[in-house]
Amino acid sequence: EAYGVKDYVVVQKGDVKAAVVGVFGKDALECAPTCELKFKDPVEAVKQTVEEIRKNEKVDMIACVSHGGTWEDENKSEDEILAKEVPDIDLIISGHTHSELKEAIQHGNTYIVSCGEYGRNLGSLSMTQKQDGRWELTSYELIPVSEEIKPDQATQEQIDALMDTVDKNYLSDFGYTREEVLAENDVEFNSLEEMGTKHEELNLGDIMSDAYIYAVENSEYYDGDPVDVAVVPSGTVRGTYTKGDITVEDVFNSFSLGIGKDGVAGYPLISACLLYTSP
């Protein structure tokens, strides 16, 4: 409550009044083992919230935005379990597992949709309310996001304003602008997907670990001891580098997670000495 987090919000669009619930899944929490936040069981939490909505709100639809995900094994598929356990949900917009569902999953009167990952698709669907008050999915498609789509001018103006804010309030402290070119690249770096699926040496990880070493050895706090190993957690890598110009924005996108104790965006870089004794 101190951070303005609500159990649900009610949205009015035309003649339709919908309650939207958000939930964080079990596997998602396990992916952040050092997280100090504690969550209720997602199914029980959503069930309780839906009961509250039914009691206190007159809505036509209940939608759930979930970071639970879907798996091939239906018995382990968190959002499918959620659909079965909380049948009053009309629509689950699923995330976390990056699943690209070409067709919606249906359990009872609940539909589950997911459009993949990294903004590559836009999900579009239509639903029609039935006589019993529930909803039927009448159309659903994934629209690839490409340069063929003409930008909406009003939305683009908002994006440009936010980008200017990033330049002024963040990057200017380091003497950079987001479009500034840092390097020319002629290397075919590994894709982001390969970082998470290939358990082997990758050139994307190599350049990032080399950057860690460079940053430590050029820090004002460097004590002169050589750096033997640099560790790059693959889950924190959020972008790769394509051939051509590498800009400040490209580099930031590849390391865009986290925040330091000083409030500055980005995980802090730390150095440590590992001691061992000979057998």
What are these regions (language model features)?
Residues E1-E148:
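Acidic, metal/ion-coordinating pockets
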Residues R54, S126-S278:
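Solvent-exposed loop/linker segments at secondary-structure transitions
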